[in-house]
Design a protein with these regions (language model features):
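N-terminal secretory signal peptides that target proteins for export/translocation
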Residues: 1-11
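Serine/proline-rich low-complexity intrinsically disordered segments, especially terminal tails, linkers
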Residues: 4-5, 21, 71, 277-281, ...
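Bacterial N-terminal signal peptides
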Residues: 11-24
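Electrostatic cytochrome c docking/interface patches
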Residues: 25-41, 131-161, 200, 249-255, ...
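Periplasmic/extracellular electron-transfer cofactor-ligation site
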Residues: 33, 39-66, 98, 102, ...
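Flexible gly/pro/ser-rich segments immediately N-terminal to CXXCH heme-c attachment motifs
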Residues: 36, 40-41, 87, 107-115, ...
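Flexible, glycine-rich phosphate/dinucleotide-binding loops
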Residues: 55, 77, 114, 174, ...
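Extracytoplasmic electron-transfer domains, predominantly the class I c-type cytochrome c fold
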Residues: 62-109, 117-124, 182-245, 287
Length: 290
């Protein structure tokens, strides 16, 4: 060992050692955004819908469909984590990258850089105290997808009835089940069951994306988790039945990249949702007037 190092006072060595350790830890850590920088991004791109307080009550909130997410409860629908869990940062970034088909939530894949997306995610997490005290649960395990076949679709149709999916989504999957007009989210907003025949699924058309919804549910909505009641085989059959309802799903493929949305499909979904929401709002208004 060098006599120079031995002669160096410990008070001089320790700060340098701590600095090196911190640098090493930072290099090996997951990318983390800067909330202060994220506030700037949020105020430019998000505040008009999600509001200054993250309560989903921005100036444009009444014109969006569905209503913008209220971030304050830390309740998010599109996750890879189990029911009731916080989402991962990757889950939140995925929504920013892909947007949500059939809704007013557009993609920011080219508008925001990866660093900017991480920054705004860090800022969004400041709206809910849950992120300071909880961690996301381990992500849902998805078994390998079996082949898409006529038999799997037939079995999936039976699973669809077994778990009363038609109660909300309707016998033909058109979102017009007996309970469709009475559903509310956790904030008391009318919520429309998804029309599975529209063409594309909000979370993505691939098998694993749909499978994950059955197992994780959609936090904050009437869509429950079936993790404790559905078997993996049943879940995959149900996935294939849901895919069979779509007029654009490539029936000869299993998973893979979905085809592009049909022209006007997104606008049709929005018009349909707005129409049903407007009808519900009118009924509520008439009730208030007595």
């Amino acid at each position: 060992m060098s006599s120079t190092i031995l002669a160096t006072p410990i008070a001089t060595v320790l700060p340098a050692l701590v600095t090196l350790l911190l640098m090493a830890g930072t290099a090996g850590a997951q990318d983390v955004g800067n909330a202060q920088q994220g506030k700037v991004v949020y105020e430019k791109y998000c505040v008009l819908c999600h509001g200054e307080q993250g309560d989903g009550k921005g100036h444009f909130s009444e014109a969006t469909t569905p209503v913008p997410r209220d971030f304050r409860q830390g309740t998010f629908k599109w996750r890879t984590t189990p029911s009731g869990s916080l989402p991962t940062d990757a889950d939140l970034e995925r929504v920013l990258v892909t947007g949500l088909y059939g809704t007013s939530m557009s993609s920011f894949s080219t508008t925001l850089s990866h660093a900017q997306r991480l920054d705004v995610i860090a800022y969004i997490k400041t709206f809910s105290p849950r992120f300071a005290t909880e961690k996301p649960e381990p992500t849902i395990t998805i078994p390998p997808e079996p082949p898409y076949t006529e038999k799997s679709v037939e079995r999936g149709a039976a699973v669809y009835q077994k778990f009363n999916c038609s109660q909300c989504h309707g016998d033909a999957g058109e979102g017009d089940g007996p309970s469709a007009d009475d559903l509310m989210d956790d904030w008391g907003n009318p919520i429309v069951p998804y029309d599975l025949t529209e063409g594309h699924i909000k979370c993505g058309d691939s098998g694993p994306n749909i499978y994950r919804v059955f197992i994780g549910g959609l936090n904050g909505t009437p869509m429950p988790s079936f993790a404790d009641s559905i078997s993996p085989d049943e879940a995959w059959d149900l996935v294939h039945f849901i895919q069979s309802l779509s007029p654009v799903y490539p029936k000869n493929l299993t998973g893979g990249a979905p085809p592009p949305p049909p022209t006007g499909a997104r606008d049709q979904t929005i018009r349909r949702t707005l129409s049903r929401s407007s009808s519900t709002m009118k009924t509520s208004s008439e009730m208030c007037r007595g």
